[in-house]
């Protein structure tokens, strides 16, 4: 079985193949999300604590959280479920998924380091991979750099260097477009939008008042016409 070990603190991961089933016995019958000590896996993992995050069986079917079985099942999946991406709105599909209990039929078991042990694992805990992209939303940039509302967020955007594929061209930097950035222009647009809304509401009120007056006038005219007809009919009956 292969162990795909990730270390989220450093952003690294490493695939380790283990042939001895006795070293893997500690993971058997465990469920996804459970924490397992790594002392029995090998001397290099002494003191480490792993969390089981997933895995695949030998045919490539992924483990599904919540299915308390050590074998494969067919589930009706919809949008929002793991292991399925719908192609249309409201589409559902029955797909084969592996239960969340670890067994011998797994080809790869995904683990995350929860607690680091005594010695470093080469290529995993002794290396740090920096994040490729920084925060994009204005509030998250403020939180990341501990800025106040008075500070200009645009000065703190993390730029990344792009190396062009063509030879002889200089590398250049790219920055993401800041989302939800409050500027004088956006405030002006907001004021303009509210002014249009207010103007439209006033216009609707005036038109409604005019229509009510017109309806009252028409009702009064119809009532007057009825009274005239009634009076004419009464006078003709007297004759």
From Swiss-Prot:
One of its GO terms (cellular component) is cytosolic small ribosomal subunit. One of its GO terms (molecular function) is structural constituent of ribosome. InterPro entries: Ribosomal_eS6, Ribosomal_eS6-like, Ribosomal_eS6_CS. The modification Phosphoserine is found at residues 148, 235-236. GO terms for biological process: cytoplasmic translation; ribosome biogenesis. It is found in: Cytoplasm. The keyword Ribonucleoprotein applies. Keywords: Cytoplasm, Phosphoprotein, Ribonucleoprotein, Ribosomal protein. PROSITE patterns: RIBOSOMAL_S6E. Component of the ribosome, a large ribonucleoprotein complex responsible for the synthesis of proteins in the cell. The small ribosomal subunit (SSU) binds messenger RNAs (mRNAs) and translates the encoded message by selecting cognate aminoacyl-transfer RNA (tRNA) molecules. The large subunit (LSU) contains the ribosomal catalytic site termed the peptidyl transferase center (PTC), which catalyzes the formation of peptide bonds, thereby polymerizing the amino acids delivered by tRNAs into a polypeptide chain. Belongs to the eukaryotic ribosomal protein eS6 family. Component of the small ribosomal subunit (SSU). Mature yeast ribosomes consist of a small (40S) and a large (60S) subunit. The 40S small subunit contains 1 molecule of ribosomal RNA (18S rRNA) and at least 33 different proteins. The large 60S subunit contains 3 rRNA molecules (25S, 5.8S and 5S rRNA) and at least 46 different proteins. Interacts with snoRNA U3. uS11 interacts with MPP10. Component of the ribosomal small subunit (SSU) processome composed of at least 40 protein subunits and snoRNA U3. There are 2 genes for eS6 in S.pombe. This is Small ribosomal subunit protein eS6B. The gene is rps602.
